[in-house]
Amino acid sequence: MERLAGRVMLAGGMSRAVMAIAAGAVGALALPPFGFFAALFFSFTLLVWLVDGCTGKPGGGLFSRILPAFGIGWCFGFGYFVAGLWWLGNALLLEADEFAWALPLAILGLPALLALFYGFAVAAANLLWSDGLGRIAALAAAFGVSEWLRSFLATGFPWNAIGYGIMPIPIMMQSAHLLGLLSITTLAVFIFASPALIGTKKGMGPGLALAGLLLAAHFGYGFYRLQTPAETPADALTVRIVQPAIDQSRKMLNTDRAEIFAEHLRLSALPPGEGKKRPDIIVWPETSVPFILTQNPDALAEIASTLEDGQVLFTGAVRMEDQGAGRPPRYYNSVYAIDSQGEIIGATDKVHLTPFGEYVPFEGILREFGIDNVIALPGGFSAASSRTPLTLPSGKTFYPLICYEIIFPGEMTPGLQGAAAILNVTNDGWFGDTPGPYQHFLQARVRAVETGVPVIRGANTGISAVIDPYGRIIAGLDYGRVGILDATLSGGSNDAFTYDTHRTYFWLIFSILMIVAVFPALSFARRQN
């Protein structure tokens, strides 16, 4: 291992960039649909050795060392995000004649921007670099902060945070309930980078022992927590999720709107399976209603005739808000609650819009510079200022998250407290049967664990599921299947944690790692001088 580490450290020029890109790309194997978490041991071990070789030019000063480290981190991130997000380009192929020009932006441009976070993380860690365990702690702390920044800067896009790589199955998800995603990400980097100590020997014993203990605790806590079955309340609701698997190209045709609506009604009216209760609530996916529902009373009447007495439909739909004479209306990506009388008894709008999918960031600036191609990308939705929990006549509430809102742990506001479930409606049909829907589904499962609240996930093409507060699938429909699932909704876990608690733990872990990193770095700097 020492010889291999030495060869990596001494590699120069283009070979270093290629190795960093390859290390990041291999790390994406830890993500769905593969879930091979051990790949990240290779990735971060190689990354540490590459940074070990960032010595800078003699007399070149601080930046001569930081810039090569930034480059290695950027290349690592570029490989990771290209391998993990290439499927985004599939959405542009649905209207290839109009948007094929944007494929390089989706497949290479977005990863190039996201890689900046990892570039800055490695550059920051390099400021505290040493020749032992301290550098592993510095790298973990820096990656934790970079993922925190990625979750909110420029609207935020925390998709495929490193922490998801160490949570492929429920037994490995439970630590997220105790610590939260950011803490898991930080500790995961420490664990995955620790084998690099074998190549340099210094700090190897304590480092590997600590990493081993953390990994054992990760599995052990998961095993312990999964011994508790999810409780089913006496007044538990039965949920039906409708998965019509409407091809996205068909949803975009005006001619098929009536047939699409009829398909949702048909699936909703199917009798429950043998031994199943009649559903109390029915869930349709994001933007299931292919027209403005409030302008179509006949559609509401058809919904009323389909629902049995006491049933409530939650459906994704586009909501239009009239702005008055001379002003264009606003459109919102919404969820309606509709009772068996065809009355809309609740509604909520999407708060966190998808950039370039539901709106174009900096549209005014782009228009001033004459960049019309980007402005022509799909969009046109307005963002709500807050989300409204949906309440049944019985008083039970559901916390709505539309599409990728569920990937943001910070979206879990106090309105989640006391909710019967998180209601997540989405349409992953844009991306086809690629890794995208599977990655999205994993993040929904982790939110259930993190919050201790079950998740009802209705997806047009899948994966639809009812998920218990431990991330286990009570019932599900695979990607691409047409059908329904009926399931009894479990209760939440009794040991709920809040996002504020998780955030406190993250900064505590960050502080401990910084202490571990700073003292060896000071000693290392003195020896070098």
Swiss-Prot record:
Membrane topology: Multi-pass membrane protein
Keywords: Acyltransferase, Cell inner membrane, Cell membrane, Membrane, Transferase, Transmembrane, Transmembrane helix
Cited Pfam families: CN_hydrolase, LNT_N
Domain annotation CN hydrolase: ranges: 242-491
Documented EC number(s): 2.3.1.269
Active site: E286, K350, C403
CDD domains in the cross-refs: ALP_N-acyl_transferase (cd07571)
Residue spans crossing the bilayer: 8-28, 66-86, 105-125, 178-198, 203-223, 505-525
Intracellular or extracellular location(s): Cell inner membrane
Gene3D superfamilies: Carbon-nitrogen hydrolase
SUPFAM superfamilies in UniProt: Carbon-nitrogen hydrolase
Biological or metabolic pathway of the protein: Protein modification; lipoprotein biosynthesis (N-acyl transfer)
GO biological process entries: lipoprotein biosynthetic process
GO molecular function: N-acyltransferase activity
Single GO cellular component term: plasma membrane
Function: Catalyzes the phospholipid dependent N-acylation of the N-terminal cysteine of apolipoprotein, the last step in lipoprotein maturation.
Family classification: Belongs to the CN hydrolase family. Apolipoprotein N-acyltransferase subfamily.
Protein name, UniProt field: Apolipoprotein N-acyltransferase
High-level lineage: Bacteria, Pseudomonadati, Pseudomonadota, Alphaproteobacteria, Hyphomicrobiales
Gene: lnt
